[in-house]
């Protein structure tokens, strides 16, 4: 039987080794998403058969992530354990945000399978080289914005952010709040969650950076490396500085 524990800040270091090598290339397969959005996803975790098993509760319906294997993990065995757990509880196994490469394996396990393709849940996936160079006509708009920003902000630089930059970050959030125009509860909640995730830089789980100009941060970002994919959890910038978002 699986024994689930709610995701907390203290549990992130337990989850991180699995996500660190996760090849699925989906933002939901990251410790940052599970923690930042724990209030919405109600994520819980368990370990079985050398795999991390995540159970979310979305709109009151328990839904599993696809198992994330560790070095000696057996995904097929973990799926069987999930099936047995659901059978004992009298519920059908539901998996959400299944990697495309693994969906066919699930379809072959059961005589009846329903697969739903939710376009709104799809991630944006970019090649690192594309974002490094913005080459070609497709990225001409981004290049123009970046050139404008660099012209108007000579000396601006991208710097890594750690707990040593706490004062810079605190000043940035004050500046950002002054420009923040969104009044919806969802937008305000997302901002609070972003600030909270930045407060955990001391855990060494994330990579953060920002654009510094004349002693002030104009933009910040926080990401998490999962396998060969850098999952960007947060991007915030001061709208009053045109071109700063593409530059970030």
Describe each region flagged by the PLM.
Residues 12, 25-28:
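Short N-terminal binding/cap micro-motifs at the start of the first secondary-structure element
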């Amino acid at each position: 039987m699986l024994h689930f524990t709610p995701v907390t800040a203290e549990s992130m270091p337990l989850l991180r080794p699995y996500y660190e090598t996760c090849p699925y290339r989906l933002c939901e397969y990251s410790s940052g998403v599970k923690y930042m959005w724990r209030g919405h996803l109600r994520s819980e975790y368990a370990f079985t058969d050398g795999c991390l098993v995540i159970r979310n509760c979305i709109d009151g319906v328990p839904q599993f992530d696809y198992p994330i294997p560790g070095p000696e993990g057996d995904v097929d065995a973990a799926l069987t354990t999930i099936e047995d757990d659901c059978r004992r509880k009298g519920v059908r196994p539901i998996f959400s945000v299944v990697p495309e490469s693994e969906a066919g394996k699930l379809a072959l396990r059961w005589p009846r399978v329903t697969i739903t393709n939710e376009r709104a849940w799809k991630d944006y996936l970019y090649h690192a080289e594309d974002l490094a160079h913005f080459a070609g006509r497709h990225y001409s708009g981004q290049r123009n914005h970046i050139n404008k920003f660099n012209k108007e902000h000579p000396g601006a630089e991208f710097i890594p952010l750690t707990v040593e930059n706490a004062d810079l970050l605190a000043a940035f959030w004050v500046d950002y709040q002054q420009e923040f125009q969104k009044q919806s509860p969802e937008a305000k909640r997302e901002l609070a969650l972003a600030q909270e995730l930045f407060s955990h830089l001391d855990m060494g789980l994330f990579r953060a950076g920002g654009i510094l100009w004349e002693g002030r941060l104009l933009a910040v970002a926080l990401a998490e490396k999962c396998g060969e994919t850098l999952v960007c959890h947060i991007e915030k910038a001061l709208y009053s500085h045109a071109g700063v978002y593409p530059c970030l």
